[in-house]
């Protein structure tokens, strides 16, 4: 960033990060509560992450299992290769 106007101040950054983390946490809980699988419902064996348009991790739910996050890289690459030019703002991809 060449210009100080392009930089995000730390307070605003923290507010945005916490907002995104709250969204991920709410998605985690919603999936857990609505699941039929005991692995998800009782063992919490699932993960939620928010990625940017390049597939980089922005935030993950607090209870997310890191092993699941590690596998999202390959999945994201495949999604971007298949749908990249057709992905629009607000699109969501869910994978198992």
At which residue positions do the language-model features occur?
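Glycine/proline-enriched, intrinsically flexible loops and inter-domain linkers
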Residues: 1-96
């Amino acid at each position: 960033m060449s210009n100080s106007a392009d930089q995000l101040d730390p307070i605003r950054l923290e507010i945005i990060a916490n907002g995104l983390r709250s969204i991920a946490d709410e998605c985690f809980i919603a999936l857990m509560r609505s699941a039929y699988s005991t692995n998800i419902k009782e063992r919490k064996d699932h993960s939620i992450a928010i990625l940017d348009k390049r597939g980089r991790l922005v935030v993950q739910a607090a209870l997310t299992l890191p092993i699941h996050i590690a596998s999202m890289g390959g999945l994201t690459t495949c999604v971007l290769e298949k749908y990249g030019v057709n992905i629009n703002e607000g699109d969501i991809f869910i994978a198992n």
